From Swiss-Prot:
One of its GO terms (cellular component) is cytosol. It comes from the Bacteria. Keywords: Methyltransferase, S-adenosyl-L-methionine, Transferase, tRNA processing. GO terms for biological process: tRNA methylation. Belongs to the class I-like SAM-binding methyltransferase superfamily. RNA M5U methyltransferase family. TrmA subfamily. Its EC number is 2.1.1.-, 2.1.1.35. This is tRNA/tmRNA (uracil-C(5))-methyltransferase. One of its GO terms (molecular function) is tRNA (uracil(54)-C5)-methyltransferase activity, S-adenosyl methionine-dependent. It is an enzyme of class 2 (transferase).
Amino acid sequence: MTPEHLPTEQYEAQLAEKVVRLQSMMAPFSDLVPEVFRSPVSHYRMRAEFRIWHDGDDLYHIIFDQQTKSRIRVDSFPAASELINQLMTAMIAGVRNNPVLRHKLFQIDYLTTLSNQAVVSLLYHKKLDDEWRQQAEVLRDALRAQNLNVHLIGRATKTKIELDQDYIDERLPVAGREMIYRQVENSFTQPNAAMNIQMLEWALDVTKDSKGDLLELYCGNGNFSLALARNFDRVLATEIAKPSVAAAQYNIAANHIDNVQIIRMAAEEFTQAMNGVREFNRLQGIDLKSYQCETIFVDPPRSGLDSETEKMVQAYPRILYISCNPETLCKNLETLSQTHKVERLALFDQFPYTHHMECGVLLTAK
Protein backbone atom coordinates (compact mmCIF):
# COMPACT_ATOMS: atom_id res chain seq x y z
CA MET A 1 0.00 0.00 0.00
CA THR A 2 1.18 3.52 -0.80
CA PRO A 3 -0.54 6.69 0.42
CA GLU A 4 -1.91 7.38 -3.06
CA HIS A 5 -2.87 3.79 -3.90
CA LEU A 6 -5.10 1.47 -1.88
CA PRO A 7 -4.94 -2.22 -2.91
CA THR A 8 -8.74 -2.48 -2.99
CA GLU A 9 -8.50 -5.74 -4.94
CA GLN A 10 -6.84 -7.24 -1.83
CA TYR A 11 -9.54 -6.09 0.60
CA GLU A 12 -11.22 -9.51 0.98
CA ALA A 13 -7.91 -11.32 1.45
CA GLN A 14 -6.62 -8.92 4.12
CA LEU A 15 -9.94 -9.15 5.98
CA ALA A 16 -9.92 -12.97 5.83
CA GLU A 17 -6.38 -12.99 7.26
CA LYS A 18 -7.54 -10.84 10.20
CA VAL A 19 -10.45 -13.20 10.91
CA VAL A 20 -8.06 -16.18 11.05
CA ARG A 21 -5.59 -14.24 13.21
CA LEU A 22 -8.26 -13.10 15.68
CA GLN A 23 -9.72 -16.63 15.98
CA SER A 24 -6.24 -17.99 16.66
CA MET A 25 -5.55 -15.36 19.34
CA MET A 26 -8.94 -15.97 20.97
CA ALA A 27 -8.69 -19.78 20.86
CA PRO A 28 -7.61 -20.12 24.54
CA PHE A 29 -10.75 -18.24 25.61
CA SER A 30 -13.46 -19.02 23.03
CA ASP A 31 -14.21 -21.14 19.97
CA LEU A 32 -16.67 -18.58 18.61
CA VAL A 33 -16.40 -17.55 14.97
CA PRO A 34 -16.16 -13.73 14.98
CA GLU A 35 -19.01 -11.65 13.65
CA VAL A 36 -17.25 -9.66 10.91
CA PHE A 37 -17.94 -6.01 10.07
CA ARG A 38 -16.43 -4.68 6.87
CA SER A 39 -15.12 -1.19 6.22
CA PRO A 40 -15.69 0.82 3.06
CA VAL A 41 -12.72 -0.04 0.83
CA SER A 42 -11.76 3.64 0.39
CA HIS A 43 -12.51 7.11 1.83
CA TYR A 44 -13.09 5.64 5.28
CA ARG A 45 -10.79 7.79 7.47
CA MET A 46 -12.44 10.92 8.83
CA ARG A 47 -9.21 12.43 10.13
CA ALA A 48 -5.64 12.67 8.89
CA GLU A 49 -2.42 14.50 9.80
CA PHE A 50 0.33 15.43 7.36
CA ARG A 51 3.69 17.11 7.68
CA ILE A 52 4.23 19.95 5.20
CA TRP A 53 7.38 19.97 3.08
CA HIS A 54 8.85 23.19 1.67
CA ASP A 55 10.64 22.45 -1.61
CA GLY A 56 11.82 25.69 -3.23
CA ASP A 57 8.67 27.46 -4.38
CA ASP A 58 6.69 24.26 -4.07
CA LEU A 59 4.82 23.07 -0.99
CA TYR A 60 3.14 19.72 -0.39
CA HIS A 61 1.88 17.19 2.15
CA ILE A 62 4.19 14.36 3.15
CA ILE A 63 4.17 11.32 5.40
CA PHE A 64 7.17 9.31 6.55
CA ASP A 65 7.63 5.67 5.61
CA GLN A 66 7.44 3.75 8.91
CA GLN A 67 10.28 1.38 7.97
CA THR A 68 12.76 3.55 6.08
CA LYS A 69 11.72 6.95 7.55
CA SER A 70 11.96 8.37 4.02
CA ARG A 71 9.61 11.16 2.92
CA ILE A 72 6.64 10.31 0.72
CA ARG A 73 4.86 13.11 -1.13
CA VAL A 74 1.06 12.89 -0.78
CA ASP A 75 -1.16 14.89 -3.14
CA SER A 76 -4.21 12.67 -2.68
CA PHE A 77 -5.08 10.21 0.06
CA PRO A 78 -7.83 7.73 -0.90
CA ALA A 79 -7.95 6.26 2.62
CA ALA A 80 -9.32 9.62 3.83
CA SER A 81 -12.77 11.09 3.31
CA GLU A 82 -13.53 12.75 0.00
CA LEU A 83 -13.81 16.05 1.91
CA ILE A 84 -10.24 15.67 3.23
CA ASN A 85 -9.03 15.07 -0.33
CA GLN A 86 -10.81 18.21 -1.55
CA LEU A 87 -9.35 20.21 1.33
CA MET A 88 -5.81 18.92 0.77
CA THR A 89 -5.83 20.37 -2.74
CA ALA A 90 -7.54 23.60 -1.68
CA MET A 91 -5.27 24.19 1.34
CA ILE A 92 -2.04 23.81 -0.63
CA ALA A 93 -3.40 26.12 -3.35
CA GLY A 94 -4.41 28.68 -0.72
CA VAL A 95 -1.17 28.60 1.29
CA ARG A 96 1.55 28.02 -1.34
CA ASN A 97 1.78 31.64 -2.57
CA ASN A 98 0.83 33.35 0.70
CA PRO A 99 4.04 34.20 2.63
CA VAL A 100 2.22 34.85 5.93
CA LEU A 101 0.37 31.51 5.94
CA ARG A 102 3.23 29.55 4.42
CA HIS A 103 6.19 30.71 6.53
CA LYS A 104 7.23 28.05 9.08
CA LEU A 105 4.08 25.97 8.50
CA PHE A 106 5.11 22.38 9.31
CA GLN A 107 1.89 20.36 9.68
CA ILE A 108 -1.79 20.36 8.69
CA ASP A 109 -4.38 18.25 10.55
CA TYR A 110 -7.79 17.48 9.06
CA LEU A 111 -10.93 16.39 10.93
CA THR A 112 -14.14 15.77 8.97
CA THR A 113 -17.60 14.30 9.45
CA LEU A 114 -20.11 12.33 7.40
CA SER A 115 -22.25 15.49 7.75
CA ASN A 116 -19.59 17.21 5.57
CA GLN A 117 -18.11 19.58 8.15
CA ALA A 118 -14.38 20.08 8.66
CA VAL A 119 -11.86 21.56 11.08
CA VAL A 120 -8.40 22.17 9.64
CA SER A 121 -5.51 22.97 11.99
CA LEU A 122 -2.33 24.64 10.72
CA LEU A 123 0.72 24.08 12.95
CA TYR A 124 3.64 26.54 12.95
CA HIS A 125 7.16 26.98 14.27
CA LYS A 126 6.59 30.72 14.78
CA LYS A 127 4.46 33.23 16.70
CA LEU A 128 1.02 33.81 15.22
CA ASP A 129 -0.19 37.42 15.09
CA ASP A 130 -3.06 39.56 13.78
CA GLU A 131 -1.63 39.49 10.28
CA TRP A 132 -1.79 35.69 10.35
CA ARG A 133 -5.40 35.84 11.53
CA GLN A 134 -6.37 38.27 8.74
CA GLN A 135 -4.78 36.11 6.05
CA ALA A 136 -6.32 32.95 7.53
CA GLU A 137 -9.76 34.60 7.44
CA VAL A 138 -9.27 35.40 3.75
CA LEU A 139 -8.34 31.75 3.12
CA ARG A 140 -11.31 30.47 5.13
CA ASP A 141 -13.72 32.69 3.16
CA ALA A 142 -12.20 31.49 -0.12
CA LEU A 143 -12.66 27.86 0.96
CA ARG A 144 -16.27 28.50 1.93
CA ALA A 145 -16.85 30.14 -1.46
CA GLN A 146 -15.93 26.71 -2.88
CA ASN A 147 -18.78 25.20 -0.77
CA LEU A 148 -16.36 23.74 1.75
CA ASN A 149 -17.88 23.89 5.26
CA VAL A 150 -14.61 24.44 7.08
CA HIS A 151 -13.26 26.02 10.28
CA LEU A 152 -9.58 26.98 10.50
CA ILE A 153 -7.34 26.88 13.57
CA GLY A 154 -3.76 28.12 13.94
CA ARG A 155 -1.44 26.45 16.43
CA ALA A 156 2.03 27.35 17.66
CA THR A 157 3.88 26.87 20.95
CA LYS A 158 1.43 27.84 23.74
CA THR A 159 -0.85 29.44 21.11
CA LYS A 160 -4.17 28.42 19.62
CA ILE A 161 -6.16 30.77 17.38
CA GLU A 162 -9.71 29.71 16.49
CA LEU A 163 -11.21 31.75 13.67
CA ASP A 164 -14.70 30.54 14.57
CA GLN A 165 -14.79 27.34 16.59
CA ASP A 166 -12.65 24.28 17.29
CA TYR A 167 -15.33 21.62 16.84
CA ILE A 168 -17.70 20.07 14.33
CA ASP A 169 -20.93 18.16 14.89
CA GLU A 170 -21.24 14.66 13.44
CA ARG A 171 -24.62 13.07 12.75
CA LEU A 172 -24.70 9.28 12.68
CA PRO A 173 -27.69 7.01 11.95
CA VAL A 174 -27.59 4.41 14.73
CA ALA A 175 -30.25 1.67 14.82
CA GLY A 176 -33.03 3.92 13.57
CA ARG A 177 -32.04 7.10 15.42
CA GLU A 178 -29.85 10.00 14.41
CA MET A 179 -27.14 10.63 17.01
CA ILE A 180 -25.38 14.00 17.24
CA TYR A 181 -21.75 13.94 18.36
CA ARG A 182 -19.67 17.07 18.90
CA GLN A 183 -16.07 16.36 17.90
CA VAL A 184 -13.37 18.69 19.23
CA GLU A 185 -10.11 19.36 17.39
CA ASN A 186 -7.10 17.63 18.95
CA SER A 187 -9.32 15.25 20.97
CA PHE A 188 -9.91 11.56 20.35
CA THR A 189 -12.65 10.65 17.88
CA GLN A 190 -13.32 7.37 16.10
CA PRO A 191 -11.34 7.52 12.83
CA ASN A 192 -13.64 5.36 10.68
CA ALA A 193 -17.21 6.71 10.87
CA ALA A 194 -18.85 3.87 8.93
CA MET A 195 -17.18 1.37 11.27
CA ASN A 196 -18.19 3.43 14.30
CA ILE A 197 -21.86 3.10 13.28
CA GLN A 198 -21.45 -0.68 13.04
CA MET A 199 -19.69 -0.85 16.43
CA LEU A 200 -22.47 1.17 18.07
CA GLU A 201 -25.18 -1.00 16.51
CA TRP A 202 -23.37 -4.20 17.56
CA ALA A 203 -23.02 -2.88 21.12
CA LEU A 204 -26.74 -2.05 21.14
CA ASP A 205 -27.57 -5.55 19.89
CA VAL A 206 -25.48 -7.39 22.50
CA THR A 207 -26.98 -5.30 25.34
CA LYS A 208 -30.60 -5.25 24.12
CA ASP A 209 -31.98 -7.35 27.00
CA SER A 210 -30.05 -5.51 29.71
CA LYS A 211 -31.27 -4.96 33.22
CA GLY A 212 -30.18 -2.22 35.61
CA ASP A 213 -27.56 0.43 34.91
CA LEU A 214 -24.41 0.71 32.78
CA LEU A 215 -20.98 1.86 33.93
CA GLU A 216 -18.54 3.03 31.25
CA LEU A 217 -14.84 3.78 31.71
CA TYR A 218 -12.94 5.95 29.18
CA CYS A 219 -16.12 7.39 27.60
CA GLY A 220 -14.50 10.11 25.45
CA ASN A 221 -17.17 12.36 23.95
CA GLY A 222 -19.89 9.90 24.99
CA ASN A 223 -19.76 7.97 21.72
CA PHE A 224 -20.89 4.63 23.18
CA SER A 225 -22.56 5.73 26.41
CA LEU A 226 -25.09 7.97 24.66
CA ALA A 227 -25.98 5.38 22.01
CA LEU A 228 -26.33 2.65 24.66
CA ALA A 229 -28.42 4.81 27.02
CA ARG A 230 -31.65 3.53 25.42
CA ASN A 231 -30.86 -0.03 26.64
CA PHE A 232 -30.31 0.85 30.32
CA ASP A 233 -32.11 2.56 33.21
CA ARG A 234 -29.12 4.85 33.83
CA VAL A 235 -25.57 5.27 32.56
CA LEU A 236 -22.61 6.40 34.67
CA ALA A 237 -19.50 7.22 32.62
CA THR A 238 -15.97 8.43 33.39
CA GLU A 239 -13.49 10.40 31.26
CA ILE A 240 -10.30 12.26 32.19
CA ALA A 241 -9.82 14.72 29.27
CA LYS A 242 -11.59 18.06 29.86
CA PRO A 243 -12.46 18.79 26.18
CA SER A 244 -13.98 15.32 25.81
CA VAL A 245 -16.06 15.76 28.98
CA ALA A 246 -17.33 19.13 27.72
CA ALA A 247 -18.21 17.56 24.35
CA ALA A 248 -19.98 14.68 26.11
CA GLN A 249 -22.08 17.12 28.17
CA TYR A 250 -23.04 18.95 24.97
CA ASN A 251 -23.92 15.65 23.29
CA ILE A 252 -26.17 14.63 26.20
CA ALA A 253 -28.19 17.83 25.72
CA ALA A 254 -28.14 17.72 21.90
CA ASN A 255 -29.54 14.18 21.89
CA HIS A 256 -32.15 14.93 24.61
CA ILE A 257 -30.82 12.14 26.81
CA ASP A 258 -31.67 12.37 30.51
CA ASN A 259 -30.24 9.18 32.00
CA VAL A 260 -26.47 9.68 31.49
CA GLN A 261 -24.08 11.11 34.12
CA ILE A 262 -20.46 11.92 33.12
CA ILE A 263 -17.73 12.18 35.79
CA ARG A 264 -14.29 13.66 35.04
CA MET A 265 -11.85 11.23 36.60
CA ALA A 266 -9.41 8.52 35.62
CA ALA A 267 -10.50 4.89 35.63
CA GLU A 268 -7.95 4.21 38.39
CA GLU A 269 -9.45 6.99 40.58
CA PHE A 270 -12.96 5.72 39.96
CA THR A 271 -11.85 2.26 41.05
CA GLN A 272 -10.61 3.79 44.33
CA ALA A 273 -13.92 5.63 44.80
CA MET A 274 -16.01 2.51 44.14
CA ASN A 275 -13.89 0.52 46.59
CA GLY A 276 -14.19 3.24 49.24
CA VAL A 277 -10.41 3.76 49.30
CA ARG A 278 -10.67 7.53 48.66
CA GLU A 279 -13.31 10.24 48.57
CA PHE A 280 -13.41 12.76 45.71
CA ASN A 281 -14.97 16.24 45.72
CA ARG A 282 -15.94 15.66 42.07
CA LEU A 283 -18.35 12.95 43.25
CA GLN A 284 -20.27 15.21 45.63
CA GLY A 285 -23.97 14.92 44.86
CA ILE A 286 -23.53 11.59 43.08
CA ASP A 287 -24.65 8.56 45.08
CA LEU A 288 -22.56 5.75 43.63
CA LYS A 289 -24.35 3.21 45.81
CA SER A 290 -27.68 4.07 44.14
CA TYR A 291 -26.45 2.70 40.82
CA GLN A 292 -27.27 -0.93 40.08
CA CYS A 293 -24.66 -1.49 37.38
CA GLU A 294 -25.13 -4.98 35.97
CA THR A 295 -22.99 -4.18 32.92
CA ILE A 296 -19.64 -2.44 32.58
CA PHE A 297 -18.36 -1.12 29.25
CA VAL A 298 -14.66 -0.56 28.61
CA ASP A 299 -12.92 0.79 25.51
CA PRO A 300 -9.38 1.23 26.88
CA PRO A 301 -6.26 2.65 25.23
CA ARG A 302 -3.98 0.30 23.29
CA SER A 303 -2.29 -0.67 26.57
CA GLY A 304 -5.50 -2.38 27.76
CA LEU A 305 -6.82 -2.54 31.33
CA ASP A 306 -4.43 -2.15 34.26
CA SER A 307 -4.51 -4.86 36.92
CA GLU A 308 -6.63 -2.83 39.38
CA THR A 309 -9.27 -2.13 36.73
CA GLU A 310 -9.21 -5.81 35.72
CA LYS A 311 -10.13 -6.72 39.28
CA MET A 312 -12.85 -4.07 39.38
CA VAL A 313 -14.58 -5.12 36.17
CA GLN A 314 -14.69 -8.74 37.34
CA ALA A 315 -17.25 -7.65 39.94
CA TYR A 316 -19.85 -7.02 37.20
CA PRO A 317 -22.09 -9.75 35.75
CA ARG A 318 -21.54 -8.53 32.18
CA ILE A 319 -18.46 -6.92 30.63
CA LEU A 320 -18.60 -5.31 27.20
CA TYR A 321 -15.03 -4.75 25.99
CA ILE A 322 -14.10 -2.93 22.78
CA SER A 323 -10.40 -3.29 21.99
CA CYS A 324 -8.16 -1.55 19.46
CA ASN A 325 -5.39 -4.00 20.36
CA PRO A 326 -6.38 -7.70 20.55
CA GLU A 327 -2.99 -8.55 22.09
CA THR A 328 -3.74 -6.57 25.25
CA LEU A 329 -7.36 -7.81 25.16
CA CYS A 330 -6.06 -11.39 25.29
CA LYS A 331 -3.69 -10.46 28.11
CA ASN A 332 -6.69 -9.07 30.04
CA LEU A 333 -8.74 -12.18 29.19
CA GLU A 334 -6.17 -14.35 30.98
CA THR A 335 -7.57 -12.76 34.15
CA LEU A 336 -11.16 -12.03 33.11
CA SER A 337 -11.75 -15.57 31.79
CA GLN A 338 -11.26 -16.91 35.32
CA THR A 339 -14.63 -15.41 36.26
CA HIS A 340 -16.35 -14.72 32.91
CA LYS A 341 -16.94 -16.49 29.60
CA VAL A 342 -17.02 -15.01 26.09
CA GLU A 343 -20.62 -14.86 24.77
CA ARG A 344 -20.12 -12.70 21.66
CA LEU A 345 -17.07 -11.88 19.56
CA ALA A 346 -16.82 -9.32 16.75
CA LEU A 347 -14.10 -8.12 14.39
CA PHE A 348 -14.40 -4.52 13.18
CA ASP A 349 -12.14 -3.70 10.23
CA GLN A 350 -11.42 -0.22 11.53
CA PHE A 351 -8.00 -0.01 9.86
CA PRO A 352 -8.13 -1.69 6.41
CA TYR A 353 -4.89 -2.72 4.68
CA THR A 354 -2.96 -2.54 7.96
CA HIS A 355 -2.00 -5.12 10.59
CA HIS A 356 -4.27 -3.38 13.13
CA MET A 357 -7.75 -4.56 13.98
CA GLU A 358 -10.50 -3.63 16.40
CA CYS A 359 -12.63 -6.22 18.14
CA GLY A 360 -15.44 -6.49 20.64
CA VAL A 361 -16.31 -9.14 23.21
CA LEU A 362 -19.28 -9.58 25.51
CA LEU A 363 -18.36 -11.49 28.67
CA THR A 364 -20.84 -12.90 31.16
CA ALA A 365 -20.14 -14.19 34.66
CA LYS A 366 -19.70 -17.97 34.89
